[in-house]
Amino acid sequence: GRAEYVITPRFAPTSSHGQLEMLGALAAEFPDVPIQSHISENLDEIAWVKALFPGCRDYASVYQRYGLLRPRAVYGHGIHLSDAELEMFHASGASLAHCPTSNFFLGSGSLDLRRCVLGDRPVAVGLGTDLGAGTSFSMLQTMNAAYMAAQSHGKPLSAAQAFYLATRGGAEALGIADKVGSVAVGMEADLAVLNLRSTPLLDFRMRYARDLSEALFVQMMLGDDRAVAATYVAGREVYRRAA
């Protein structure tokens, strides 16, 4: 099937030295298995990690020490990563999941997306809803929050960039962009079909959309789960909204 096992330390502060060593050994034994965890969402958490792992220079160094930074390793948040830590992510091939609704809900701050993806040490970033503290599983609402996060750094996020994060960007971060994340011959065709006029407000606003870019921007700012008209998994329809 398409399901995969994932090596998942809850996060460094709740993991013992022995647990992390065992997970690192497992990662070394199975180099193609994804790794998923959490890093640098808030400042108190970072101080906690420093107290628990005094022999490590910073938060990312903890995961690096145990062999848990590598391609297909995805870490949620990363709001407060230093330049040195971003360099470690770049060099190792590890990636970030940007979870803006969680960050806003907890008052943790917001990710400076362009700082992560541009420059001479780019890091792959996908868009995530989070589970415990995320406020919506709608990717449209998550794109809305990502736009606001970018605005808080004075670096606007275009509709094209947001939709990339939610599709191809996520696939790149997970190391599966050869299978999903774009519409092309040979891809596995995991698709969400959007109704651009799914609510009375969207129907009204779309009358004034001048081009595709504006139409997509309207969806990410005003849309929610009601916009999803149908979904396909591996080319097979698995959901269709009732008329």
Where in this protein do the model-derived segments appear?
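Histidine/acidic residue-rich metal-binding segments in metalloenzymes
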Residues: 1-95, 107-125, 178-181
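Conserved, mostly hydrophobic/aromatic
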Residues: 7, 38, 63, 89, ...
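Fold-independent oxyanion-binding glycine-rich loops
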Residues: 10, 39-40, 77-79, 92, ...
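Short, acidic/turn-prone active-site loops that include or flank metal/cofactor-
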Residues: 41, 100-104, 131-132
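Conserved protein kinase catalytic core
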Residues: 44, 83, 136, 201, ...
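Short, flexible, mixed-charge acidic loops at enzyme active sites
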Residues: 51-56, 137-142, 207
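His/Asp/Glu-enriched, well-ordered alpha-helical/loop segment
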Residues: 65-72, 114-204
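C-terminal cap of metal-dependent C-N hydrolases
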Residues: 188-242
